[in-house]
Amino acid sequence: MGLEEEAVQKKHNRVMIYTIFWSLVFVVVVIYLNASQLKPVKGQMRIGVTYMTMNNEFYQTLNAEIERVADEKGDLLLVRNPELDEEKQSQQIDYFRQQKVNVIVINPVKGDSPKIIASLKRAQQAGIKIIAVDSQLSHFTVDASVVSDNYQAGVLVAQRLMKQKNEAKILLLEHKGTISAEQRIQGFLDTIQSEPAYQIVGREETRGQTELALPAVSQVIQDGLVFDTVVALNDRAAIGALAAIKENQLAQPISIYGIDGSP
C-alpha cells in the first residue's frame, strides 16, 4: 500500500516543549519569591497541575521536567488528569484550592468552560496564582500565560503541504472548544483559503485522541469520502488516521500531517 507519512515540526516542537518548560519555571519562581515576601515562615511550595489529558506525549514530557525540578527543590507537586472532562477539571481546581496550593498550572479542557472558569475564580479569590499553559482561557485573566504559537503551527503545516503537493483533497481532524487546537486549524485554513487547488472535503471531531480518530476516519472511508490528505490537530489524532487507513487497506497514497513531535 502506498502511504506517505509526514512528520511535521518534530524538532521544532521538541524545542517548544523546553521553551514552555523553562518559561514556566521562571514564572513559578517569581510567584514563589513574591509569596515568600508575604509569608515570613518559609514553607514548601505547593503546585497544583491539571492538563486537559495525560494521554498525550507532549504533556507527559512537559510534566516530567516540571516534576524533576519540583523534586530537586523539595516542592510538592499535585498532578491531576481530567481526561478531557471539564466537570472533572473543575473539581480538581476546587481540590487544589482546598489543599491551599500556592499556584495552579492549568491546560484547560475547554477555554470557555463556565465550570472551569468559576472554579478558577474561586481559587484566585483565595489568593492562588493561576498559570495557563499551551492554551488560553476566555473571560478570565490569569496571572501568567505560557503558550506556544499554535496559529503559526497551522500555518507551517499548510506551507509544508503546499510545498509538497500541487493540489489536495483534505480531511481535517479537529478538537473543537480547545483554543490551542482551534488556532492550529485556523492557521492552516487561513493559509490555504486563497488556493482553490487545496479543498477541505471533510471535518471530523476527534478531541485529539487516537481512539476517537480511528473510528471517525474509518467511517468516512466506508462512507466513500474521497481524500488524499489528512491534517490533524495533533499527532495522537494523526496516529488514529494512520491506523484507520491501514485497517481499511486504502490503495491510494495518503499524506498525513500532525503537530506535536510525538514519537
Question: What is each stretch, according to the model?
Answer:
Residues 70-82, 86, 169-174, 192-211:
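Short beta-strand elements in bilobed, periplasmic/extracellular small-molecule ligand-binding domains
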Residues 17-33:
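Hydrophobic membrane-insertion alpha-helices, especially the h-region
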Residues 109-122, 188, 207-263:
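Hydrophobic alpha-helical
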Residues 1-12:
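N-terminal Lys/Arg-rich, disordered targeting/topogenic segments
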